[in-house]
């Protein structure tokens, strides 16, 4: 008697096997969950210990860059960074605030952690554009009109600012409206608009009122500038005027559209 054919055997196997089994999702066992939780706690605890408890990340050095007049030692002393403390606990904003308060010469400062043991202090100092004589000393004024330091020796090639506000007439009215700080800012504004050659030759910036600012140049020459307004146009007019009348002793650009020279 012949046995079942291959096709018949395949059909019976398919019938007996039935539909494919679906694997059920088995939730992780409690033991696995506990092991993972303990591992996370250990990792977190280890991280906290490394940052706060170990000697691996304690502050050991404070580096300073960008100084010119100031010394790195002065900056470190003013910063008062707590060497030996965990690096992560150093309050960088407080360090920046101390530097700005104790050293007004500093214009900008970046306080950065340098892992694993350092703090970097990158400073930018203010640069004087004018000086005000005060007794035997000199007060330095930056390009924003901030009087930031008093020095015993005048910095080289920085013009002197003379505040001589008039106390009567229209100039007195101007003084009531614009105080000394505002007049200083106007003088700085004028100094920043001068043509390069004129800036190099300027010895004194004299302010009598908001709209009465003049310059004393090398060789006894003078310039009536007026107010700080229309500075670019006045600078162009002064350049052209000096080129047209090189032997003149006085130049007036207080009205930019009507420049004049005299005293040749």
From Swiss-Prot:
POTRA domain location: 57-126
Positions in the Extracellular compartment: 54-264
Lipid bilayer topology: Single-pass type II membrane protein
Xref: InterPro entries: FtsQ, FtsQ_DivIB, POTRA, POTRA_FtsQ_type
Region (Disordered): 1-24
Subcellular location: Cell membrane
Record flagged with keyword Membrane: yes
Cytoplasmic side of membrane: 1-32
Keyword Ion transport attached: no
Superkingdom of the organism of origin: Bacteria
Pfam families: POTRA_1
GO CC annotation, single: cell division site
Keywords: Cell cycle, Cell division, Cell membrane, Membrane, Transmembrane, Transmembrane helix
Membrane-spanning segments: 33-53
Record-level GO BP terms: cell septum assembly; FtsZ-dependent cytokinesis
Similarity field: Belongs to the FtsQ/DivIB family. FtsQ subfamily.
Function: Essential cell division protein.
PANTHER family the UniProt entry points to: CELL DIVISION PROTEIN DIVIB, CELL DIVISION PROTEIN FTSQ
Stated name of the protein: Cell division protein FtsQ
Protein species of origin: Streptomyces coelicolor (strain ATCC BAA-471 / A3(2) / M145)
Gene responsible for this protein: ftsQ
């Amino acid at each position: 008697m012949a046995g079942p054919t291959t096709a018949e055997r395949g059909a019976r196997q398919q019938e007996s096997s039935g539909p494919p089994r679906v694997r059920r999702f088995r939730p992780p066992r409690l033991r696995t969950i506990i092991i993972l939780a303990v591992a996370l706690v250990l990792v977190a605890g280890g991280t906290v210990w490394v940052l706060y408890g170990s000697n691996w990340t304690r502050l050991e050095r404070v580096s300073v860059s960008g100084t010119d007049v100031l010394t790195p030692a002065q900056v470190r002393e003013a910063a008062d960074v707590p060497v030996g403390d965990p690096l992560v606990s150093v309050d960088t904003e407080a360090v920046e605030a101390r530097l700005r308060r104790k050293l007004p010469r500093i214009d900008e400062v970046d306080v950065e952690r340098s892992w694993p043991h350092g703090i970097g202090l990158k400073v930018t100092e203010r640069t004087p554009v004018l000086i005000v004589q005060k007794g035997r000393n000199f007060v330095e004024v930056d390009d924003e009109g901030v009087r930031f330091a008093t020095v015993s020796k005048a910095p080289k090639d920085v013009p002197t600012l003379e505040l001589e506000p008039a106390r009567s007439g229209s100039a007195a009215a101007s003084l009531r409206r614009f105080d000394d700080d505002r007049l200083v800012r106007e003088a700085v504004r004028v100094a920043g608009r001068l043509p390069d050659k004129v800036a190099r030759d300027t010895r004194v910036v004299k302010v009598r009122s908001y709209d009465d600012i003049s310059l004393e140049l090398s060789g006894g020459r003078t310039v009536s500038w007026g107010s700080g307004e229309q500075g670019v146009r006045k600078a162009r007019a002064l350049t052209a005027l000096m080129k047209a009348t090189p032997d003149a002793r006085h130049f007036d650009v207080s009205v930019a559209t009507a420049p004049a020279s005299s005293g040749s």
